[in-house]
Structures are given as C-alpha cells and as structure tokens.
C-alpha cells in the first residue's frame, strides 16, 4: 500500500520543530520560506537563476507630473502579488484596484524639486513584467476597524480559469507574445482566523485532470469544485434556512468559510517549459520508495 510522503525533511529545513510543524501556518509565509531556502541551496550551482526566472516579475512605482516632463520611479521585483478581496467582485477588479492611479493636486501637490517645484501629478503602480508562474495572494485576512481585530473576509470573489494580464502592463512592456494565463493551482483556507485548515487543488499537467490534495488524501476534482466552491460569498438558501454549520469553527453562518487564499497561474505560452513530464529519475530514491 502506498503512503503519503512525510514532510518532516521539508519543515526541518525551515528550522521548525515538531510543535511548529503541527501549528496552523500562513500558506503565503510558507511559500516564501520555501523559496528562500531553495534559493540558498541553489547559490553557486547551474540552477542558481532558475527560481527567479520562473517566479519573479517586476513592478514600477511612479509619480508622473501632469504639466511638465518629469517622472520619479523605481523598479522592484515581486515573488507574489497581494490583491484586495474586500470591495472587489472579481480577480480583474482586484488587478484594476492594484494599479489604480491617485492624483496629487491642490494641497497634496508633488514636489518635483528644482526647477519644477510643486506640480499636479499621477501616482501609482504598474507591472513591467509577469513571471511564467504567477502567484496571487488574495487578502482574506484584514484588520476590521469596527471590531478592532483581525478578521477573515469571506466575501464572494470570482477568479477565472484563464485571464489576460496584458491590460495591467506598462506601455513599455514586451507584447511580442500573449500574456494569457491559465489556472493550475488553488490553495483554499477553510475556517476562521483562529481555527482552520488548508488544502489545495492542483492541475499538474497541461491538459490533465484537477486533483484535490488534503493532508494525506488525493482525489480527482471537477472544475466546479475548483472554481465555484471556492469563490466564497453567501450560500443559496431555501426559505427559512438560518445558516450552515461551518467546518472547524462549528458556527452557523450565511457565508462560506472555505474560499481561495492563493492562486497559481501559468503563462500559456510557457506552459510546455514549466510543466515538463516528471520521470522516475527526477524523484529522490528515498521518496520514490513505496511500502
């Protein structure tokens, strides 16, 4: 009988002890720890640039004067993009919110220095490039000003199987090939801020099936299970229904407490390079053994 592979070696490499390994960890922080450790191990090897080439994109933060030819800007790398859920109904809404332009005028004019002085200006962020593998962090946990505490945002937020990232790129971006991305991973959080559980839906091949990975259980999944069941939002109730008991919290709620927390998209023009077939030689011998 086949057994699930132990994660002990992985968590030990993060410096976690047994107690930390069994605590609920934030999946975005875990992803960053994994990337950091892999980068450390790859330094000085032929694979040193492999991770940045796969996962790193670039943003430009800018302040551009409206009436004179002056712009202040800086280019920065990103490994993932944090997108607001609250106030945005779709993934496209969240991207538009991210690159929304602020106008600096009146008492809030921008000081462009000599010889221009105070100027009306546009301030914002735009993407210079997206990586072949794009990690999107949906901000499901936020500080609630009314409750004065961190709360989970269970609002409905729709994400597509495919989306075009071109509208969010700067005018100078390379448009020689398509910027359409296809969904290949959905990391779900079920529960509340204090009590919950993570599981994942993954499509490991270009044209294959979706699978649900939940602790040591792996099952085939439908597109409905991948998409609609993880948008969050209100349940559809029959008349008189007061709510549904939520897993982990055991409280009744009119909103789904299971919803997407991270999304993994792969650029379609690069999918053949990213999703290479995995052979037995690629799997370490001690992991490939079955009992």
Positions of predicted regions on the chain:
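Exposed substrate/partner-binding surface patches
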Residues: 1, 43-46, 69-291
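Papain-like cysteine protease catalytic cores
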Residues: 1-77, 113-116, 128
């Amino acid at each position: 009988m086949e057994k699930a592979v132990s994660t002990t070696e992985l968590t030990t490499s993060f410096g976690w002890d047994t107690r930390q390994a069994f605590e609920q960890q934030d999946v975005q922080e875990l992803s960053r720890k994994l990337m950091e450790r892999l980068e450390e191990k790859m330094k000085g090897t032929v694979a040193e640039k492999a991770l940045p080439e796969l996962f790193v994109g670039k943003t430009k933060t800018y302040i551009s004067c409206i009436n004179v030819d002056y712009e202040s800007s800086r280019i920065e790398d990103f490994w993932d993009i944090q997108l607001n859920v609250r106030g945005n109904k779709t993934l496209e809404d969240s991207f538009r919110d991210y690159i929304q332009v602020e106008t600096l005028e009146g008492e809030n004019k921008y000081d462009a220095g000599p010889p221009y002085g105070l100027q009306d200006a546009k301030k914002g962020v735009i993407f210079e490039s997206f990586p072949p593998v794009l990690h999107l962090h949906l901000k499901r946990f936020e500080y609630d000003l009314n409750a004065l505490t961190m709360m989970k945002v269970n609002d409905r937020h729709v994400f597509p199987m495919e989306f075009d990232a071109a509208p969010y790129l700067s005018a100078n971006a390379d448009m020689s090939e398509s910027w359409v991305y296809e969904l290949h991973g959905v990391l779900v959080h079920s529960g509340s801020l204090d009590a919950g559980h993570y599981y994942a839906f993954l499509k490991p091949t270009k044209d294959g099936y979706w699978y649900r990975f939940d602790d040591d259980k792996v099952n085939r999944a439908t597109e409905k299970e991948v998409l609609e069941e993880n948008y969050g939002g209100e349940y559809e109730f029959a008349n008189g229904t007061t709510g549904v008991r939520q897993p982990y919290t055991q409280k009744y709620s009119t909103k789904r407490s299971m919803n997407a927390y991270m999304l993994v998209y792969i650029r379609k023009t690069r999918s053949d390079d990213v999703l290479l077939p995995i052979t037995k030689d690629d799997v370490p011998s001690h992991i490939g053994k079955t009992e």
